[in-house]
Amino acid sequence: MFKRSLIAASLSVAALVSAQAMAVTGGGASLPAELYKGSADSILPANFSYAVTGSGTGKNAFLTNNSSLFGTTGTVHYAGSDSVLSGSELTTYNSNYNGTYGPLIQIPSVATSVTVPYRKDGNTTLNLTSAQLCDAFSGAKTTWGQLLGTTDSTPIRIVYRTGSSGTTELFTRHLNSICPTRFATNSTFTNARLPAGGTLPSNWVGVAATSTVVSTVKATNGSLGYVSPDAVNINSNAEVSRVNGNLPTQANVSTALGSVAPPANAADRADPSKWVPVFTNPSAGYSIVGYTNFVFGQCYKDASVSTDVRAFINKHYGGTTTNAAVAAHGFIPLTPAWKSAIVSAFYTGTSENLAIGNTNVCNTKGRP
């Protein structure tokens, strides 16, 4: 279940070396990177590249078709992102590229938690409330004694993600729901922590990659971070804090996600923003949850790319083929209802003209 940092660290390098031979080029979020490529049970096809850049860069690369952001050349065919496409991003894409490239498709890949790894010598049962997370990550409380109501003078050392990270967006969305005067929802931690761009405590550490968060936390007593479930043992309270009494187990994440339904009418199904529910402060289960997503084009000039993307959609969403790998990496497979809705809209559907490669839409359009 637990993939080590060596694999994750090699993903971007592997993408650079092999991108020219790959038929389908993509990249983005580091949160699901080991699920996607580089592990024995990774779910992306062999001819799909995946450059680990973070969600913000991944979205930007796709939205502007800038493959240099993935360290390669040619067309960007897809992206992975835990950060939801904003209204302004969708508007800009539609204005600049929809007429030539065709519509984009944003769909959830798997459900995820954001876990809170820690090192506090002598404490293997840490349980923090959402309010305490606000205190620690805002810097309002600077020692563990202040945070936990003891005399412990150990400094709190926050390990945070630099750059634009979907994991940060998921995490700060929850914090914003609890302490909106201290946190905005943002994919960049230093912009999410208010005031944006404010000075951080000198002992806090910013790291660029998911794979570095846990090792940096473990290196120093008093450290606290946030990271994807793939990087930790989600069942071990000695490794990750409980939040409001709950560990980020698959059962607790499923409870938090509840029974939210996929888009139910044609107008919503045609709206990429409707396909990714967001969660701020679930009423039950683990408190920090969301989805990591794929962004595809509906239309590709290269018919083989369209065929390959369609085949992956059918494999990942058309049954349970990838469920074991998803669970082994600490994520939650989409429910049958969600999978069926995605297949019906973007693979088999014809009446609403949403399917990848639909000739009514893609006759003269396509990502080059």
Swiss-Prot record:
Induction: Contradictory; shown to be induced in phosphate poor media. Does not respond to decreased phosphate. GO terms for biological process: protein secretion by the type II secretion system; protein transport by the Sec complex. Residues 1-23 form the signal peptide. SUPFAM superfamilies: Periplasmic binding protein-like II. GO terms for molecular function: alkaline phosphatase activity. It is an enzyme of class 3 (hydrolase). GO terms for cellular component: extracellular region; periplasmic space. Has both a phosphomonoesterase and phosphodiesterase activity. This is Alkaline phosphatase L. It comes from Pseudomonas aeruginosa (strain ATCC 15692 / DSM 22644 / CIP 104116 / JCM 14847 / LMG 12228 / 1C / PRS 101 / PAO1).
